[in-house]
């Protein structure tokens, strides 16, 4: 795919007054007929992370806790709130422990790699 840089008409008049020139990028699609199917990008492909993974993001734990809350009855007792926050605290503590161990390992490798 060829890339061509062109000055737009708006930016041509503005570039005479300023020191920076603004460029717009245009692509020619002449090579699109010879594309291999390997290079074609599919927008329907999604990457999924299993929920049991220890490296899942905090947003997934929040969405999981909300889905648990929706499955429960509409009555919000103090024990369910306590249970929810204690499970979130345990999960966060486990993530912090894993992250701390990883950082310690990287620091150790950095120190011993220099000698």
Curated annotation (Swiss-Prot):
Keywords: Cell membrane, Developmental protein, Membrane, Transmembrane, Transmembrane helix. It is a single-pass membrane protein. The keyword Membrane applies. The keyword Disulfide bond does not apply. InterPro entries: DVL, DVL_RTFL_polypeptides. Residues 1-12 have a biased composition (Basic and acidic residues). This is Small polypeptide DEVIL 13. It comes from Arabidopsis thaliana.
């Amino acid at each position: 795919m060829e890339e061509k840089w062109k000055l737009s008409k708006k930016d041509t008049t503005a570039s005479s007054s300023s020191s920076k020139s603004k460029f717009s990028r245009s692509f020619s699609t002449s090579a699109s007929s010879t594309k291999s199917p390997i290079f074609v990008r599919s927008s329907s492909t999604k990457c999924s992370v299993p929920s049991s993974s220890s490296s899942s993001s905090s947003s997934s734990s929040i969405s999981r806790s909300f889905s648990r809350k929706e499955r429960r009855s509409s009555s919000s007792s103090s024990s369910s709130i306590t249970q929810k926050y204690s499970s979130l605290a345990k999960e966060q503590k486990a993530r912090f422990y894993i992250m701390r161990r990883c950082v310690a390992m990287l620091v150790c490798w950095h120190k011993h790699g220099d000698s």
